[in-house]
């Protein structure tokens, strides 16, 4: 119903009731009806204005494509997933036959070297310029806690082709022991994993290494617990 129709109906009702009303009681009834009619007309007019100017009502529909995402990382990952599968990639694992040191190996079942990445001098050599995801995980294991503080470090370093200086790009340190195990107490085993990862702009010829400070604590019990890799984006 439009606002004009509502006003017309109210006026007709006022005329009918005015004819039937008489005396003081009728005057009071007419006054109440007039006040009610005024409020009704004012409310209807306000509602019409709000609807007309779009203050209330259905919201504007979003564009068919949804909100635009302009994050550089999102765009990079999206374009990378749509590209061909000739991107450089490497995933090397720890050599379980080299106790006392962390040696990377690319010949195990779950290792991967593709599209130009090389493993030289225990370092991954980048074959092309671009953005790369660099990641690594190590797992430490021990029995009891010594009297001296025990700190475990895991560091990923880069030697850029443009400046032959070793620079740490990812680093973490953990301490599995908060106090010494008493001589009379049972030495309980502990485990301490460290995972690191990040996206970096690399150049062709850059060398990447993943190292730890205490290789004697490395846990080789399960395959795939200690690894290092890069993925071109």
From Swiss-Prot:
Primary localization: membrane
Lipid linkage positions (N6-myristoyl lysine): 20
Residues with site note (Cleavage): 34-35, 39-40, 49-52, 77-78
Topology Extracellular: residue spans: 57-233
Residues modified by glycosylation: 80
Membrane topology, record value: Single-pass type II membrane protein
Cellular compartment(s): Cell membrane
GO terms of biological process kind: extrinsic apoptotic signaling pathway via death domain receptors; immune response; necroptotic signaling pathway; negative regulation of protein-containing complex disassembly; positive regulation of apoptotic process; positive regulation of canonical NF-kappaB signal transduction; positive regulation of extrinsic apoptotic signaling pathway; positive regulation of JUN kinase activity
GO cellular component: cell surface; extracellular space; plasma membrane
PTM: The soluble form derives from the membrane form by proteolytic processing. The membrane-bound form is further proteolytically processed by SPPL2A or SPPL2B through regulated intramembrane proteolysis producing TNF intracellular domains (ICD1 and ICD2) released in the cytosol and TNF C-domain 1 and C-domain 2 secreted into the extracellular space.
Cystine crosslinks: 145-177
TM segment ranges: 34-56
A Pfam family that the UniProt record links to this protein: TNF
GO MF, one example: cytokine activity
Modified residues (Phosphoserine): 2
Keywords per UniProt: Cell membrane, Cytokine, Disulfide bond, Glycoprotein, Lipoprotein, Membrane, Myristate, Phosphoprotein, Secreted, Signal-anchor, Transmembrane, Transmembrane helix
Cytoplasmic side: 1-33
Keyword Disulfide bond included in the entry's annotation: yes
Domain THD: 88-233
Assembly, per entry: Homotrimer. Interacts with SPPL2B.
Function: Cytokine that binds to TNFRSF1A/TNFR1 and TNFRSF1B/TNFBR. It is mainly secreted by macrophages and can induce cell death of certain tumor cell lines. It is potent pyrogen causing fever by direct action or by stimulation of interleukin-1 secretion and is implicated in the induction of cachexia, Under certain conditions it can stimulate cell proliferation and induce cell differentiation. Induces insulin resistance in adipocytes via inhibition of insulin-induced IRS1 tyrosine phosphorylation and insulin-induced glucose uptake.
Entry similarity comment: Belongs to the tumor necrosis factor family.
Protein name (database record): Tumor necrosis factor
Gene designation per UniProt: TNF
């Amino acid at each position: 119903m439009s606002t004009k129709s509502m006003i017309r109906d109210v006026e007709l009702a006022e005329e009918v009731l005015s004819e039937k009303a008489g005396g003081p009681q009728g005057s009071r009834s007419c006054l109440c009806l007039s006040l009610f009619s005024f409020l009704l007309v004012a409310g209807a007019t306000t509602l019409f204005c709000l609807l007309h100017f779009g203050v209330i009502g259905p919201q504007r529909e979003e564009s068919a494509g949804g909100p635009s995402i302009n994050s550089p990382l999102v765009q990079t990952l999206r374009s990378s997933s749509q590209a061909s599968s000739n991107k450089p990639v490497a995933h090397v694992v720890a050599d379980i036959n080299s106790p006392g040191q962390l040696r990377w190996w690319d010949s195990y079942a779950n290792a991967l070297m593709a599209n130009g990445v090389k493993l030289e001098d225990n370092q991954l050599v980048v074959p092309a310029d671009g953005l790369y995801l660099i990641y690594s995980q190590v797992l430490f294991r021990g029995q009891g806690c010594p009297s001296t503080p025990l700190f475990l470090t895991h560091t990923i370093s880069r030697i850029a082709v443009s400046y032959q200086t070793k620079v740490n790009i990812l680093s973490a340190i953990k301490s599995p022991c908060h106090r010494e195990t008493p001589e009379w107490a049972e030495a309980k085993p502990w485990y301490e994993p460290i995972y690191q990862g990040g996206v970096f702009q690399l150049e062709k010829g850059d060398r990447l290494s993943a190292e730890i400070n205490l290789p004697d604590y490395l846990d080789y019990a399960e395959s795939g617990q200690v690894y290092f890799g890069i993925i071109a984006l």
